[in-house]
Regions:
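C-terminal alpha-helical "lid" subdomain
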Residues: 1-20, 32, 52, 57-64, ...
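Conserved NTP-binding/hydrolysis module of P-loop NTPases
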Residues: 7-15, 19, 80-100
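Conserved P-loop NTPase "ATPase switch" module shared by AAA+ and STAND
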Residues: 19, 112-136, 140
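Pre-Walker A adenine-sensing motif
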Residues: 27-39
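Conserved AAA+ ATPase "SRH/arginine-finger" region at the nucleotide-binding site
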Residues: 76, 174-187
Length: 270
């Protein structure tokens, strides 16, 4: 027999799929800012934020919304092999494949980009850009200087990546979209909207402001941490629902189970 908490648990599997995008006030503002930035004559745009603030799903949402309107390409997984990466870039720019054993002539590629300036405007979304080497970042910068290809680069906000951004792109990035952890209100809307989207009305209604406040205390409004906590909460609920049902009240959300999840994840030390 399948527990209803199984479906609630799966709602909070960390994902960048478009169907899992939740439109919060803050995320809508970030999306509109990014969409507006694409229309400006900018060569590079930086999407900046701590891990778990929604950079990947924002890029994917942008790509899915614009892929039939613009010459836009999304590199969701970093390709750290320079030769492989520029094979992909070559295909994006020239719309042709190179034989696998052929190296990209970078100077020729830059010249090609200059030749198509004003004829095409290519947008490349690079996620997890902190994985690219300094040399690759420099070549990305040189390609962007051609003004026929625009890069939107997502970076984790850490001290090291802050330095990378300043060193390599300070004079070329004219727009920065910074994503932050959500507020208490964002967290409440996020949790409720995720559950309501899957028609889990009773469970959503059982999670009151007090419970949200406790979850927020542990997650600090970070969406990845919020997902982890809720997934673990419903995993515990699912276990009791299947094996010891009298331990849970289906009509009331449990502070004790929130704390059990927090202990399991290391937010509370005992």
């Amino acid at each position: 027999m399948e527990s209803r908490y199984y479906h609630a648990k799966n709602v909070f599997i960390d994902s960048i799929e478009i169907d899992d995008y939740i439109a919060l006030d803050s995320s809508v503002i970030s999306y509109k800012q990014l969409q507006h930035s694409i229309e400006k004559p900018l060569k590079m745009i930086l999407v900046f934020g701590r891990p778990g603030t929604g950079k990947s799903i924002l890029l994917n949402y942008l790509y899915e919304n614009l892929k039939y309107q613009k010459d836009i390409h999304y590199f969701a997984t970093p390709t750290t092999n320079e030769e492989e990466f520029f094979h992909k870039i070559f295909k994006v720019i020239t719309k042709k494949n190179l034989p696998s054993n052929t190296r990209v002539n970078f100077s020729t590629l830059v010249d090609y980009c200059r030749d198509i300036q004003g004829k095409r405007e290519i947008v490349v979304l690079l996620d997890e850009a902190q994985m690219y080497s300094a040399e690759m970042m420099e070549r990305i910068r040189l390609l962007s200087d051609s003004r026929s290809i625009k890069f939107i680069i997502a970076l984790h906000k850490t001290d090291q990546e802050d330095l990378i951004a300043k060193e390599h792109f300070q004079s070329r990035i004219w727009e920065v979209v910074e994503l932050r952890n959500g507020t208490l209100e964002d967290t409440q809307n996020y949790i409720h909207k995720k559950l309501l989207k899957k028609n889990l009305f009773e469970i959503a209604n059982s999670i009151k402001s007090y419970h949200i406040g406790l979850i927020y205390k542990f997650s600090k409004g970070n969406y990845r941490e919020t997902n982890k906590i809720l997934f673990t909460i419903f995993e515990i609920y699912e276990y009791y629902d299947l094996h010891n049902k009298n331990k849970i009240d289906e009509n009331s959300f449990s502070k004790k189970i929130i704390e059990m999840a927090a202990i399991k994840l290391g937010f509370i030390h005992v």
